[in-house]
């Protein structure tokens, strides 16, 4: 190799090694493979190929950086999609090792339960160290008088189901939208979202109200249990008849406008009826798959 070609080769090698756009030695060696024969050791060809390689690499890195920044921005601004929620659902049953550890966690996060525990521990300590004083006896009676109603409040708080109307509407909307099967994975997603809703709106102290998806399903069944629902067709027909009768007896438009009433939010009875129809449909499909030939019982 002549000294002139050697000079150009060394110069190009230093430029390539100093170029930060090339990330790995594999890319650098790929660029060197172009110069294995003497036919390519022309100074003009070397510089031209070098500039093309750098521009191509910068373009690829620029596209990759822009796509990564766009993805990061979209992940930061947008809410998680339904697919990501379904793939990353973690219920308390999956997080805690046992139901006892879950129950202890819930109790220690409940304010009334913590106050009750403090009162009980204080009463026990006073009884142990100051059991022979009259003041201690009087104070013990006072503490226990607070402990009894406090215990009742904690038991009611953990045993009584959520009665918030907006929460029930949210649950019915999720059921109508997702149409969950009896043992379907959709119930896991619904349970996860309802736990988050209770925590975000201050209805529960932790995002772990429902321990598993069966608990959320059981809560929904308690809403429709013992209720009698009319079919949507019948209700729609009755609505038409009622509308016709109202038109006949309404009188002037101003009188009709005055007789109308404002309803905030969706109709709860209609939501409950639609969700009950979906549940009944999937109940039939579930039992038909489990025990074929039992259509006569539905």
From Swiss-Prot:
Pfam families documented for this protein: DUP (PF00674)
Keywords for the protein's UniProt record, in alphabetical order: Cell membrane, ER-Golgi transport, Membrane, Transmembrane, Transmembrane helix, Transport
Region: COPII binding, residue numbers: 297-298
UniProt topology in membrane: Multi-pass membrane protein
Record region (Disordered): 235-262
GO biological process: vesicle-mediated transport
Major location category of this protein: membrane
Cytoplasmic-side segments: 1-111, 159-298
Location relative to the cell: Cell membrane
Family matches, as InterPro entries: DUP/COS
TM region(s), chain numbering: 112-132, 138-158
Gene Ontology, cellular component aspect: endoplasmic reticulum; plasma membrane
Keyword Transmembrane annotated: yes
Regions of this protein lying in the Extracellular compartment: 133-137
Quaternary structure and interacting proteins, as annotated: Interacts with PRM8. Binds to COPII coated vesicles.
Other information: Present with 259 molecules/cell in log phase SD medium.
Entry function: May be involved in endoplasmic reticulum exit trafficking of proteins.
Protein name, UniProt field: Pheromone-regulated membrane protein 9
Organism: Saccharomyces cerevisiae (strain ATCC 204508 / S288c)
Gene: PRM9
């Amino acid at each position: 190799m002549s000294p002139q070609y050697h000079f150009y080769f060394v110069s190009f090698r230093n430029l390539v090694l100093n170029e930060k756009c090339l990330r790995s030695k594999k890319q650098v060696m790929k660029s060197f493979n172009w110069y294995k024969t003497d036919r390519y050791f022309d100074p003009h060809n070397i510089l031209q190929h070098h500039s093309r390689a750098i521009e191509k690499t910068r373009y690829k890195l620029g596209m990759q950086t822009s796509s990564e920044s766009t993805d990061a921005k979209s992940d930061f601004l947008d809410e998680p999609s339904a697919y990501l929620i379904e793939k990353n659902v973690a219920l308390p049953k999956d997080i805690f090792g046992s139901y006892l550890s879950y129950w202890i966690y819930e109790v220690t996060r409940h304010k009334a339960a913590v106050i009750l525990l403090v009162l009980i521990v204080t009463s026990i300590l006073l009884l142990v160290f100051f059991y022979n004083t009259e003041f201690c006896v009087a104070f013990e009676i006072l503490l226990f008088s607070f402990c009894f109603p406090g215990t009742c409040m904690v038991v009611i708080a953990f045993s009584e189901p959520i009665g918030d109307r907006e929460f029930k509407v949210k649950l019915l909307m999720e059921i109508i939208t997702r149409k969950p099967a009896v043992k379907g994975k959709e119930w896991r997603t619904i349970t996860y979202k309802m736990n988050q809703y209770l925590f975000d709106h201050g209805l529960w102290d932790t995002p772990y109200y429902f321990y598993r998806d069966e608990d959320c399903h059981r809560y929904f069944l308690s809403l429709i249990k013992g209720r009698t629902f009319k079919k949507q067709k019948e209700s729609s027909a009755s609505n038409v008849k009622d509308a016709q009768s109202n038109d006949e007896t309404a009188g002037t438009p101003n009188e009709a406008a005055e007789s109308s009433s404002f309803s905030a939010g969706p109709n709860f009875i209609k939501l409950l009826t639609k969700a009950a129809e979906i549940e009944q449909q999937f109940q039939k499909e579930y039992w038909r798959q489990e025990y074929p030939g039992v259509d006569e019982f539905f």
